[in-house]
Amino acid sequence: MACELKEFLVKNDMYPMGDQVEKKRKAISKMTEYIQQWGKKIYIESAGVADDTDVKAATIYVYGSYRLNVYGNNSDIDACIVSNSTITRDDFYDGLYAELLNNPDVKELKQIPSKRSPHLSMIYLNIEFDLNFSRTAYTSLPDNLDILNENILKNMDELDTRAINGVRNTDIIDAFVPNHSEEAFRVMVRTIKLWTKKRGIYGYVYCFLNGISIEILVAQVISENYQLDNVRLLEKFFQVYSSWDWLRTPVMLGTNDDFNDKKKEGVIQILTPASPSENAAFSITKFSLEMIKRELKRGQEIVHEFSSEGVNDWAKLFKPRHLFCGYYIFIEFIVTSSSLEGLTTTIGKFESGLVNLMKGLSEIEEIIEANVIPNGFLDEENEKYFYYVGMNVKRDCPVDISTPLNSFLSIVNSGKDLIVDASIKKRSEIPTKFAHSVKRSITKSQEIKETSSQVPSSAITETFDIPTKPSIEQQLKAKEENSIPNEEKKEQLKKEMKQEANTIVKNSSTDDDFMKRFTRKN
């Protein structure tokens, strides 16, 4: 069964194929050379020294999935530019950005204006990169710089520390995994990442799990169950976390000196290992937590069946979830810009604000469920992105979402680069072009880059079956057009969709009822 699992992961691009390994290696090498030359030029101009001055003013440290060797065929590269004291964040965010605009090897360059981790995103030599920045106190970076030595954090501000901790966290996680369990760790991380994406519970900006939180969760389970094979480890993963006391017990690797300071940050805590620790699960809300817990329970039941009965139908575990199923009301966001290129370049600004919106909605007592539908829908012909938040509310109560919604809109509409409109839609009003097997072939701007504390900016192209009201009839019609062979499969589809809806909808009002009581003050 372990072999079949790995084969399934390979088929779903969770391993690099063909020449991708060499292409990524060359792109990293060229990017490192470019940044070192850029840093030296900035230093010479700022310090007024001779052009032949021997100084190492900047270099690159790769981290995340690539550094841990858990990257897939289409994975991007996370990298941190570590500089000397001469180079400033403005030199990086604005100066380097301006230079890269004129670099013929760079495409889809964009600034991601996250308050927690502003960074640059691009395609360089046909490889997706996300670059952030950390400034050290060194005049010249030593060749043998010890990235894990806490002295490196001296005189760093919060953004610098957070950026370099992306590298430090990766190295600590790598060291935490026993040597003989490295391959099991890589298989498990790929498995859980694919599972979360297929089941619609992946993405920091969508208030779900991100890359580093998955790596920490997996490393913790493996450290205590290193004797198990891959399938048993997967079963143990679901068993442990489906019964975890998330509200009281943080997940952390070993001891954590920052535990007392971090235990009140966020609904749950998945603490990064490098000091100062961050909560990798800070964006998760009480609503998205319930969704994650339901999916963990489902995963446990399926993998236990595989393990106990010798079944290896891995497609069942990774079957895409009907993302719109179970919600009566949606907030629809239509995002436009001056051009399609401008839209894909600046969509990160919209996504970076979703966490605060969802946290605001989670504080409204009348709302019993509110989650982002992960990823947006790109309407290339009309140059628009569509995003949705699914909601259910208590019966017979007025509902006012003005405060969080208007606050969100004021922020994302504050510049000239984006125009965001919001409206309330019943499930039956979701555009039919998004209703059946929608393929979101969206460029890299879809997601904001995931680290322990920054938001992601890479995209995934995924196919989900998304029902609208009347969802079952419409879905069956679509399936009939694709030649469903028999009545048994139709009935199975009905059963699956009703089950998914019933896991969410409890004591919720209908969409028509909600529309009568909904309040949004402009």
From Swiss-Prot:
Keyword presence, Ion transport: no
Organism in which the protein naturally occurs: Entamoeba histolytica (strain ATCC 30459 / HM-1:IMSS / ABRM)
Coiled-coil residues: none
Keywords (A to Z) from UniProt: ATP-binding, Cytoplasm, Magnesium, Manganese, Metal-binding, mRNA processing, Nucleotide-binding, Nucleus, RNA-binding, Transferase
Residues that, per the record, bind Mg(2+) 2: 76, 78, 130
Stated name of the protein: Poly(A) polymerase
Cofactor(s), by name: Mg(2+); Mn(2+)
A Pfam short name: PAP_NTPase
Similarity field: Belongs to the poly(A) polymerase family.
Principal location class: cytoplasm
Biased composition (Basic and acidic residues): 476-499
Entry EC number(s): 2.7.7.19
Reaction catalysed by this enzyme: RNA(n) + ATP = RNA(n)-3'-adenine ribonucleotide + diphosphate
Keyword Ribosomal protein set for record: no
Lineage of producing organism: Eukaryota, Amoebozoa, Evosea, Archamoebae, Mastigamoebida
Protein function: Polymerase that creates the 3'-poly(A) tail of mRNA's. May acquire specificity through interaction with a cleavage and polyadenylation factor.
Alphabetized Gene3D superfamilies for the sequence: 1.10.1410.10, Beta Polymerase, domain 2
Co-factor binding details: Binds 2 magnesium ions. Also active with manganese.
Binding site for Mg(2+) 1: 76, 78
InterPro entries tied to this protein: NT_sf (IPR043519), NuclTrfase_I-like_C (IPR011068), PolA_pol_cen_dom (IPR007012), PolA_pol_NTPase (IPR048840)
Compartments in which it is found: Cytoplasm; Nucleus
BP terms from Gene Ontology: mRNA processing; RNA 3'-end processing
A GO CC term assigned to this protein in UniProt: cytoplasm
